[in-house]
Amino acid sequence: SIRGLAQYTDEVRERFLNLAISYNINIITGSMPYVKEDGSLYNVGFLCRRDGTYDMYEKVHVTPDEVKSWGLSGGKMVRTFDTDCAKIGVLICYDVEFPELSRIMADQGMQILFVPFLTDTQNGYSRVRVCAQARAIENECFVVIAGSVGNLPRVHNMDIQYAQSGVFTPCDFAFPTDGKRAEATPNTEMILVSDVDLDLLNELHTYGSVRNLRDRRNDLYELKIKKPLQD
C-alpha cells in the first residue's frame, strides 16, 4: 500500500542527499508518501542541496482520487527555498493548476518554479503543461516541469503514465517567442539539460513590454494567505 511505501521515504531522501553531495549538484526529488506524527499521510518531496542540507515541500491540493484511493491529506506549506543558484519554488503536480500558490512564491522572490508531476493521460498532462506555461508568464519566472514515464502494470494509479518534461520562460523579447526554452521527447525516458539566465528576469521586471508583477491593481484586489506560510 502507499502507506507501506512511506517507511522508505527517509531512506530515499538520504540516498538523494548523498547523490547531491557526491555529484556537487542540487536535486529536487519527485514526490513520495510521508507519514507525520499524527498519522496523516502526505505527498511530499525534498530539495537536497550540495552542501548536505535539505528542505521538504508538500503537495497542498490533493486530487479526489488521491483522497479516495490513498487517503492523502493536503499540506499547509507554501514557501520558497534558497539555493546557491537561485530562489526557487516547488509545486507538486496538481498544485500548479492553482495560480495563487505560485503568486505567493513570486511575491517572495521566486526565480525558478519546479513542478514534479505524474499524469496518466494526455488530458492530465495538458493541464499541468498549460498551467505551467501560464505561471511562467504571470510570475515572470522560469518554470521546469519533470514527469514520470513508463508503465507499472497492475499497480493502481501508477499503471500508465504520460509526460513530456520541459523548461518554460516568460513570453517577451529576450525569451523564446513560444515561451519554450527546452523540451524532452514526448513520453520518452531521457535527461533534459538547459541553461537559464536569471539576469533576463531582472530586466523583464523593469523593462518588459508587459509587467505582470508590477502592474497588478492592488487598489482593486489582493491575495492573502489565511494559514501560516509554513506548517
Language model: regions and residue ranges:
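Active-site catalytic loop in hydrolytic enzyme cores
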Residues: 14, 18, 36-111, 121-134
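Metal-dependent catalytic neighborhoods of phosphoester/phosphodiester hydrolases
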Residues: 1-9, 38-40
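Recurrent small/Gly-Pro-centered beta-turn motifs in extracellular repeat architectures
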Residues: 31-32
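A hydrophobic, small-residue-rich beta->alpha segment in the mid-to-C-terminal subdomain
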Residues: 181-203
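Cysteine/selenocysteine-centered motifs that mediate thiol-based redox chemistry or coordinate metal-sulfur cofactors
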Residues: 83-108, 201-231
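CN hydrolase (nitrilase-like) catalytic-core segments centered on the catalytic cysteine
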Residues: 8-28, 97-189
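Hydrophobic residues at beta-strand termini and immediately following loops
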Residues: 57, 81, 146, 184, ...
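Conserved hydrophobic/aromatic positions in well-ordered beta-strands
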Residues: 46-48, 166-168, 192
